[in-house]
Regions:
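Active-site-adjacent beta-strand anchor residues
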Residues: 7-8, 35-36, 83-84, 88, ...
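Alpha-helical structural signal in soluble globular domains
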Residues: 17-24, 45, 49, 74, ...
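Short, surface-exposed acidic-centric catalytic microdomains
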Residues: 26-70
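Helix-adjacent hinge/juxtasegments
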Residues: 54, 62-105, 110
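Short alpha-helical
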Residues: 13, 40-41, 62, 88-89, ...
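Donor/substrate-binding cores of folate-linked one-carbon enzymes
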Residues: 21, 87-186
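N-terminal Rossmann-like dinucleotide-binding module
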Residues: 1-41, 45
Length: 186
């Protein structure tokens, strides 16, 4: 079993998907959920699954480095970090401690639509395909090596919420498969 941490900031659908995925059950040990938002509903999901939760509000720290050092002290035995809707940019200092061991899932076909509100921006641009990317995290926001992508043709009879749900379905299928590949190839 490989010790991992999952970082999330919101509802936690990707966190829950990874934590309950039967194919990952014998491969990863989720040592903790790291959450930067004390009001995030992902915290409740972690409690239901008896997964230790580290709630770290950045507002309680003097600097980003102090915030990240505190997290690092609490996850020192972890081998990989999987970001699942974590809405913070990770500093070069933190990245240096987990070089090549932090993976993110992003709701766009990178390199298109980096950053926030990717689905909405792609939808408003009336793109033919919307998709997801799973990538290693580096110093450039959503700029790391792409590990996997998937997409679907957009039906503009659907609402933005319906398209967003389809994106989440892709995420829930592809993220576990990609994690398995990463961990079994290394």
């Amino acid at each position: 079993m490989i010790d991992v941490a999952i970082f999330a900031s919101g509802t936690g659908s990707n966190f829950y998907n990874l934590a309950t995925n039967p194919e990952l059950k014998n491969l990863i040990n989720i040592r903790c959920l790291v959450c930067d938002n004390p009001k995030a509903s992902v915290i409740e999901k972690a409690k239901l699954l008896n997964i230790e939760t580290l709630i770290v509000n950045p507002k309680n720290f003097d600097s980003k480095i102090d915030y990240e050092k505190y997290i690092l002290e609490n996850i020192e035995d972890v081998k990989y970090i999987f970001l699942a809707g974590y809405m913070r940019i990770i500093s070069p200092y933190f990245l240096g401690k987990f070089k090549g061991k932090i993976v993110n899932i992003h709701p766009s076909l990178l390199p298109l639509y980096k950053g926030k509100d990717s689905i909405k921006r792609a939808f408003e641009d009336k793109v033919e395909f919307i998709g997801i990317s799973i990538h290693y995290v580096n110093e450039e926001v959503d700029g790391g090596q792409i590990l996997a992508q998937d997409k679907f043709r957009v039906d503009y009879k659907l609402s933005l919420d319906e398209v967003t749900q389809k994106v989440h379905e892709l995420e829930h299928r592809l993220y576990p498969k990609t994690i398995i590949k990463i961990l079994t190839d290394n």
